[in-house]
């Protein structure tokens, strides 16, 4: 009887531990789902901003083939201002970091789910590493931007962000494009350096878009997997 009592107590303790672990895994999963949802929103914004950067790089290259005076100088100055775009993607990593640092990965018994979580973290690290390089090149571009555009124009344009170009009215753009602007022909050396650097930025943003898309797909898969595994709404 004593053996049976001890055995039953052991079973009860195992069940209790299992229930506690399941509860903790479920609570962590709720936070992870929210983090991944926030990440997908941030990824969409980043992809849109990168798309605008890529497009205006093409505009600058096209304008550079013209005589950079009057309207062409104004347009070139306008787009040049937005070449300094170094806003990072704010990943939501606190929950997963807490899970790792507290040894709570053991609560997640689904190996495929764990594998996806680790794959997502590796992909985020890869994206962040490249964006660190993007920021370094962006800071190098700032010196060239300052050499090329007029400080007053720079000040007026600083009220607008890269993403706002997508919704900026034609009237507002036309005001900038028709603003009195000095010839940029005497700044061709700085312009050449700027264009070469922006082409590098453009190329890497195009390449990084693939990583962002993979991260978005994986985040959505994890949201669905976590909801299914832990019966979340």
Give residue ranges: language-model regions:
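Membrane-embedded hydrophobic alpha-helical segments
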Residues: 1-19
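Long, hydrophobic alpha-helical segments that serve as membrane-spanning/inserting helices
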Residues: 14-233
């Amino acid at each position: 009887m004593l053996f049976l009592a001890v055995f039953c107590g052991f079973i009860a303790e195992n069940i209790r531990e299992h229930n506690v672990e399941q509860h903790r895994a479920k609570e962590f999963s709720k936070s992870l789902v929210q983090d991944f949802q926030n990440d997908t929103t941030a990824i969409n914004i980043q992809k849109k901003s990168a798309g605008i950067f890529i497009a205006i790089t093409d505009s600058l290259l096209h304008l550079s083939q013209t005589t950079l005076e009057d309207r062409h100088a104004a347009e070139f100055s306008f787009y040049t201002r937005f070449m300094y775009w170094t806003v990072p993607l704010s990943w939501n990593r606190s929950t997963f970091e807490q899970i790792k640092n507290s040894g709570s990965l053991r609560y997640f018994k689904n190996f495929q789910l764990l594998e996806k979580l680790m794959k997502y973290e590796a992909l985020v690290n890869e994206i962040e590493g490249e964006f660190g390089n993007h920021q370094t090149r962006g800071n190098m571009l700032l010196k060239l931007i300052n050499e090329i555009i007029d400080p007053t124009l720079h000040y007026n344009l600083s009220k607008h962000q890269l993403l706002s170009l997508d919704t900026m009215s034609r009237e507002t753009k036309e005001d900038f494009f028709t603003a009195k602007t000095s010839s940029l022909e005497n700044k061709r050396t700085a312009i050449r350096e700027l264009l070469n650097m922006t082409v590098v930025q453009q190329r890497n943003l195009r390449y990084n878009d693939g990583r962002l898309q993979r991260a978005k797909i994986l985040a959505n898969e994890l949201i669905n997997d976590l909801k299914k595994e832990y019966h979340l709404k």
